[in-house]
Amino acid sequence: MLPEKESPKLGQTVWAVGAGLGFPPSMTSGEMAFAEQVINGYRYQLATAPIIFGNSGGALFAYSDIRKKYEMVGVPSKVAAANFQVVTHMGWSIPTEAVYIFLRENFHGFIVGDKYLKPENRKSSSEDKKE
């Protein structure tokens, strides 16, 4: 996964992987078009890699020249539409920063390398709000 606090670069080649409409997994390529857009209070990033219904929950990947590996840069989550027509080359994905937050808030930070805490040693989110 893309390191925390990093964002994919505009124009960077990306690949969307998913099992759209129940078919076997497939891969499409495109470019990062928007690094961040807020829609209905949620942050998204836009890529031109075609996605279709069912790709949501798959992954958006990019190659890191620095780390010499492919990294997940987002989670495809919605497709654009205009005049009741799906625009498959406008795929919105959830940024990896939101994935890090979600995993930590749900006590799965160990997936991204955080130290594992036994349930009895964890703070509840209500305790965090008191501090």
Walk through the language-model features, giving the residues of each.
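Envelope-exposed proteins and targeting segments
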Residues: 10-13, 28, 43-45, 56, ...
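Active-site substrate-binding loop(s) of clan PA
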Residues: 1-23, 61
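Short, Lys/Arg- and Gly-enriched loop/turn segments at beta-strand edges
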Residues: 22-30
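C-terminal cap/linker of serine protease catalytic domains
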Residues: 72-131
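Active-site-proximal beta-strand/loop segments in catalytic clefts of secreted hydrolases
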Residues: 17-20, 49-50, 75-79
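Gly/Ser-enriched beta-turn/beta-hairpin loop segments
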Residues: 23, 34-46, 85
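Catalytic nucleophile loop of clan PA
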Residues: 32, 50-76
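Extracellular/periplasmic catalytic domains that process cell-envelope and extracellular macromolecules
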Residues: 6-9, 23-24, 38-40, 53, ...
